[in-house]
């Protein structure tokens, strides 16, 4: 009888062991997880100080979130965040600085798919451009590094970035698709002193499609935006001050010389050389089509209000027809020139190479009226 009770008790205990959940202190052995799933787990990395750039560049593919905190990038070195893993999130904190050296740059490079780059509220990328500024920009003098290469980005976002005192051009956007940039600030106002800063373009765009830039504030000494090639580009709700306004081109002389379906909307252009400009290269080929400027306000333009030139690189020559400008729309454009030294509207087209233009609600005052416009399209006038 005792043996039977012991046997029954043992059987019940065995069943209980099988049915009971595993003891947390002694977990049950489970099948090893798939290696690919482990690789996808979130890893947060923080890099800072003088070794931060080097460590970030070496370890970037091990991190899904990268914090760059008060990084001091050594001279002649790129903060290289190219070829990031899909979905990587990059966050700037504090002040990012760059050592001095005469070289072409860039100071920062980012590429990848589904990338997010952003700055925290106190973050600043400080180029300390006065160390390079000599009044010559990229045309001579010291060799100056370009600032930020947003090249080969796909389905990505750059937001809330504050850049101060770039040595020369700021954002180069090239080979990118479906890139959104919001709340970008470039403050190069220190370069206005003695006209020392030059060629400090805010956004240079080439060979890219579906680029959207909104909420930008650009204070610089060259084009706020220059679209050299690309399609489906949208720039809106922004301020451009002190530079060369909203530009298409120069178009011509590159591997890709097509600009198509571009919209500038709701932009204020202040104290700039001109507000609206299309520039194509004499003797070259390409095309500019479906470009719209809508709801643009500008004040105190110094050289031109609106300027279209098909001989941009040599205005002494008769404009050529190799880069036609078609389907060009200006709608609700209101602005002022600083004084009579500013030409309100200037158009220099090749014979028959500017067509299908529609201008409505365009008003430019305070400057002089040009008598030298060439081949003005039907329905358009240089005397508004």
Swiss-Prot record:
InterPro entries: Glyco_hydro_28, Glycosyl_hydrlase_28, PbH1, Pectin_lyas_fold, Pectin_lyase_fold/virulence. Pfam families: Glyco_hydro_28 (PF00295). Residues 20-40 form a propeptide. Its EC number is 3.2.1.15. Disulfide bonds join 45-63, 224-240, 349-354, 373-382. GO terms for molecular function: polygalacturonase activity. The active site is at 222 (proton donor), 244. Coiled coil: none annotated. It is an enzyme of class 3 (hydrolase). GO terms for biological process: cell wall organization; pectin catabolic process. PbH1 repeats lie at residues 176-207, 208-229, 254-280, 288-310. SMART domains: PbH1 (SM00710). Keywords: Cell wall biogenesis/degradation, Disulfide bond, Glycoprotein, Glycosidase, Hydrolase, Repeat, Secreted, Signal, Zymogen. GO terms for cellular component: extracellular region. PANTHER family: POLYGALACTURONASE. Involved in maceration and soft-rotting of plant tissue. Hydrolyzes the 1,4-alpha glycosidic bonds of de-esterified pectate in the smooth region of the plant cell wall. Belongs to the glycosyl hydrolase 28 family. This is Probable endopolygalacturonase C. It comes from Aspergillus niger (strain ATCC MYA-4892 / CBS 513.88 / FGSC A1513). The gene is pgaC.
């Amino acid at each position: 009888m005792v043996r039977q009770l012991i046997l029954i008790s043992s059987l019940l205990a065995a069943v209980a062991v099988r049915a009971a959940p595993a003891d947390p202190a002694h977990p049950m052995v489970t099948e090893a997880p798939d290696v690919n799933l482990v690789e996808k787990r979130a890893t947060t990395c923080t890099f800072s100080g003088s070794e931060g750039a080097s460590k970030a560049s070496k370890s970037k593919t091990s991190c899904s979130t990268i914090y760059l905190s008060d990084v001091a990038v050594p001279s002649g070195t790129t903060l290289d965040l190219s070829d990031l893993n899909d979905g990587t999130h990059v966050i700037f904190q504090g002040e990012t600085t760059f050592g001095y050296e005469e070289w072409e740059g860039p100071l920062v490079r980012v590429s990848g798919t589904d990338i997010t780059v952003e700055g925290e509220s106190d973050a600043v990328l400080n180029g300390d451009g006065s160390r390079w500024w000599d009044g010559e920009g990229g045309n001579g003098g010291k060799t100056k590094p370009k600032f930020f290469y947003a090249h080969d980005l796909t389905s990505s976002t750059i937001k809330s970035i504050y850049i101060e005192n770039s040595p020369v051009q700021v954002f180069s956007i090239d080979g990118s698709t479906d890139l959104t940039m919001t709340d970008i600030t470039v403050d190069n106002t220190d370069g206005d002193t003695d006209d020392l800063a030059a060629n400090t373009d805010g956004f240079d765009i080439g060979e890219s499609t579906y680029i959207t830039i909104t909420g930008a504030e650009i204070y610089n000494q060259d084009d706020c935006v220059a679209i050299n090639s690309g399609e489906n580009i949208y720039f809106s709700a922004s301020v451009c001050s002190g530079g060369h306004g909203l530009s298409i081109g120069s178009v011509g002389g590159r591997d890709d010389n097509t600009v198509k379906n571009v919209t500038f909307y709701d932009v204020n252009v202040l104290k700039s050389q001109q507000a609206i400009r299309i520039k194509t290269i004499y003797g070259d080929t390409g095309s500019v089509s479906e470009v719209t400027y809508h709801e643009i306000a500008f004040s105190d333009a110094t050289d031109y209000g609106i300027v279209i030139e098909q001989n941009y690189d040599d205005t002494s020559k008769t404009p050529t027809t190799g880069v036609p400008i078609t389907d060009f729309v200006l709608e609700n454009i209101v602005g002022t020139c600083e004084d009579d030294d500013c030409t309100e509207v200037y158009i220099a087209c090749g014979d028959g190479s500017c067509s299908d233009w529609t201008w409505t609600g365009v008003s430019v005052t305070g400057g002089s009226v040009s008598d030298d416009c060439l081949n003005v399209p039907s329905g358009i006038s240089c005397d508004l």
